[in-house]
Amino acid sequence: MTDLHYRCGWVALMGPPNAGKSTLLNALLGQKVTIVTPKPQTTRNQIVGILTDDDAQTIFMDTPGLTQVRGRLSKTMIQAVWQSLNQADIIMPVLDAHLYIRHPEFLDRDLAPVAQALASEERPMIVVVNKVDLFGDKSRMLPLLTRLHEMWPRADIFPISALHKDGLADLVELIRKKLPKGQAQFPEDQISTAPLRFMTAEIVREKLFMHLRQEVPYSVAVDVESWEEDEERGQTVIHATIYVARPMHKAMVIGRAGQSIKAIGTEARKDIQELVGGKVHLELWVKVREHWTEDTAFLRDLGLMAE
């Protein structure tokens, strides 16, 4: 029987790098569906997370951070953002309050072009002001909130802390009210559209970001080459290759006496076991593939570029 009051729709999370979009999505779902690191520009693909309750199904799209385009990979990531916007019923920019209060001059640099591009939008828009937990004196936020109202006069401006989950229940309620009426598009127990292989590769990439310094994690890619169920041993056997752009990066990923790759593999295996709900045997290999970020065919093979 069709529920005429049920709501269902797509919400595009967008904004500058390191604003907390992925942290917010994981917090809204109460489960990890996208990787989170302290480094900006971690997300490369559109990640879909699904929140279902008795009254609504909200389909969130976590997108790469909006930044200046540098190279084919970066261009592909920015294209993913605008493709998500075309699909969205609600547009939800997410920004780092702490950054813009400390550096108000960055506000027009980062957000004015986005506000201008969306000026004619008639779809609902919620501007999420994240990381408000970093301010004891909330009055310091008033100039920022005032400027955001000027930039997005029709939008709801909503302060939250994704890390501490402050304000999230009210945010979910606001989103639900703005969703169009319609029936659920996914089963009620599904929380993401990402295949297990993709999520496994993302977990390995997250650990690379956590262990490697400077520019190295930005020049690595992970490809899960095989996935087999070993019923005799009761485990999932996964072979993944880490591609790096330079020989020196390979040495850094492996580490002295293999200590770095061992730590990356151990931490990744624990998260993958939680993901699959069972024992995992993970083997990681490191290969050099120079200029892979400019290789269109390779980017397509990795799922980083549409066919």
From Swiss-Prot:
GTP binds at residues 15-22, 62-66, 130-133. Residues 160-162 are annotated as: G5. Residues 7-181 form the Era-type G domain. GO terms for molecular function: GTP binding; GTPase activity; ribosomal small subunit binding; small ribosomal subunit rRNA binding. Residues 41-45 are annotated as: G2. InterPro entries: G_ERA_dom, GTP-bd, GTPase_Era-like, KH_dom-like_a/b, KH_dom_type_2, KH_sf_prok-type, P-loop_NTPase, Small_GTP-bd. It comes from the Bacteria. Keywords: Cell inner membrane, Cell membrane, Cytoplasm, GTP-binding, Membrane, Nucleotide-binding, Ribosome biogenesis, RNA-binding, rRNA-binding. Residues 130-133 are annotated as: G4. Gene3D superfamilies: 3.30.300.20, P-loop containing nucleotide triphosphate hydrolases (3.40.50.300). Residues 212-290 form the KH type-2 domain. It is a peripheral membrane protein. GO terms for cellular component: cytoplasm; plasma membrane. Residues 15-22 are annotated as: G1. It is found in: Cytoplasm; Cell inner membrane. Coiled coil: none annotated. Residues 62-65 are annotated as: G3. One of its GO terms (biological process) is ribosomal small subunit assembly. Monomer. An essential GTPase that binds both GDP and GTP, with rapid nucleotide exchange. Plays a role in 16S rRNA processing and 30S ribosomal subunit biogenesis and possibly also in cell cycle regulation and energy metabolism. PANTHER family: GTPASE ERA, GTPASE ERA, MITOCHONDRIAL. HAMAP family: GTPase_Era (MF_00367). Belongs to the TRAFAC class TrmE-Era-EngA-EngB-Septin-like GTPase superfamily. Era GTPase family. This is GTPase Era. It comes from Desulfovibrio desulfuricans (strain ATCC 27774 / DSM 6949 / MB). The gene is era.
